[in-house]
A protein has these predicted regions:
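Membrane-interface amphipathic segments in extracytoplasmic regions
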Residues: 2-401
Length: 401
């Protein structure tokens, strides 16, 4: 047989094998994703989604304003004794404990598999995905920049480790997704600062804060990096679907891998996320902040007040203690525990200790919320300005927690 013909036949056979493997791999992925989606939808509650259950799970999607809701709504309603212990890296409480009534966490929806079925209501806030990506990038830079007070990365890392082991509070470095994003950005900031010192450069010409590569990782580099691709891309959808890299589901990694490899399979994930949103007690929108806050007070706040009054639980915990349980993980976006200078300024302006929960009404709740949010924003602004000074002239405008 002619050698050219042999080569042609060999190439054809090789192509058929590769194609067969590709089809088999796609079918495998399709089966994996469809099985997960079917099981997820099958376990969705058929009960009245408008009625507040015994446990309120606030699924905090990062950079949507959830910290404001926690401090200015939920901490005004629930005493610290009713808060579930933090579950920032693993479940830290017995879900059957009746006294535990409020869980606020960056954990994804998969944690609900550990919560009392039929006795848990879920609430969340969503934000325009593009704005949320910008804000995630900016917050990664803002927190990482706080470490630049140290002479080098080794010093910063060691000090952070010592403070985290000494303090009972929860650091941002313990919280998903910041426990991945901040160290990555921190290492990059120190590398760029060291490079500037080596070159002896201090003149920066770019006026675009998202493209100042001499000072900070450009936004384009950030969003195209595998770390951001794993955590930030479609982050809210994966969080609501329970498929983040912090998921409690053993199949989550494979499902996420298949969806990343075959984008059309993402529709199954989207349908599960949409169904879960539809079954939640409340879904707010960052862009419609005022309207969403008013709705939260009337839909969720009113039921919490009624529920706690009936159980004689409201009004007994206005003075929030400073125990580990009372140290809010949502404080992590202000409570960095990175160095003594930062730590000295870590105060919460929401005046948790001054709230009288007796005779609480929706109207009083909204009045308290307005005062609280004003103070909280001032604190966040001061902290943001102080942090960004360390990477001047880079500066950002978006600011939602």
């Amino acid at each position: 047989m002619d050698s050219t013909l042999k080569c042609t036949i060999l190439l054809i056979l090789l192509g058929l094998v590769v194609n067969a493997f590709s089809v088999t791999d796609y079918e495998h992925c399709e089966n994996v994703v469809k099985k997960w989606a079917t099981n997820s939808l099958k376990h969705e509650s058929k009960e009245d989604k408008h009625a507040l259950k015994d446990l309120l799970f606030f699924l905090h999607v990062p950079r949507t304003g959830g910290r404001t809701y926690f401090h200015c709504f939920l901490k005004k309603l629930y005493s610290s004794s009713l808060e579930c212990p933090r579950s920032y890296d693993k479940l830290r409480f017995d879900p059957s404990k009746e006294k535990c009534r409020l869980l606020v966490t960056h954990d994804d929806y998969s944690i609900s598999s550990k919560l009392p079925r039929g006795r848990t209501s879920v609430v969340t806030i969503l934000r325009n995905p593009i704005d949320r990506v910008f804000s995630t990038y900016e917050f990664s830079v803002e927190v990482a920049a706080r470490f630049l007070v140290h002479p080098n990365l080794t010093s910063a890392t060691q000090m952070a480790g010592r403070l985290r082991s000494k303090n009972k509070g929860v650091s941002t470095l313990d919280i998903w997704p910041w426990k991945y994003l901040v160290p990555w950005m921190r290492e990059d900031l120190f590398a760029r600062r060291d490079a500037r010192k080596t070159r002896g450069t201090s003149d920066f010409t770019s006026g675009d804060p998202y493209n100042m590569e001499d000072i900070v990782m450009p936004l384009l580099n950030y969003i195209n990096n595998p770390i951001a691709h794993e955590i930030v891309h479609n982050g809210a959808t994966f969080q609501i679907a329970g498929l983040t890299n912090n998921s409690y589901l053993p199949e989550s990694h494979e499902v996420r891998h298949c969806v990343d490899k075959y984008n059309n399979l993402g529709d199954y994930v989207l349908q599960v996320a949409k169904k879960r949103l539809d079954n939640m007690l409340y879904v707010g929108l960052t862009e419609d902040h005022r309207e969403s806050a008013t709705m939260f007070a009337n839909v969720v706040g009113q039921q919490v007040i009624s529920q706690l009054v009936n159980s004689n639980a409201i009004g007994k915990g206005a003075n929030v203690n400073n125990s580990e349980q009372g140290t809010s993980f949502s404080d992590s976006e202000l409570d960095q525990n990175t160095n003594s200078d930062e730590k000295g300024n870590e105060t919460t302006s929401s005046d948790d200790n001054e709230v009288n929960q007796d005779n609480m009404t929706v109207e009083k709740l909204m009045d308290t919320y307005e005062v609280c949010i004003s103070g909280l924003r001032k604190t966040q602004t001061r902290r943001r300005i102080a942090s960004l000074k360390r990477i001047s002239p880079a500066n950002f405008t978006k600011e939602v927690s």
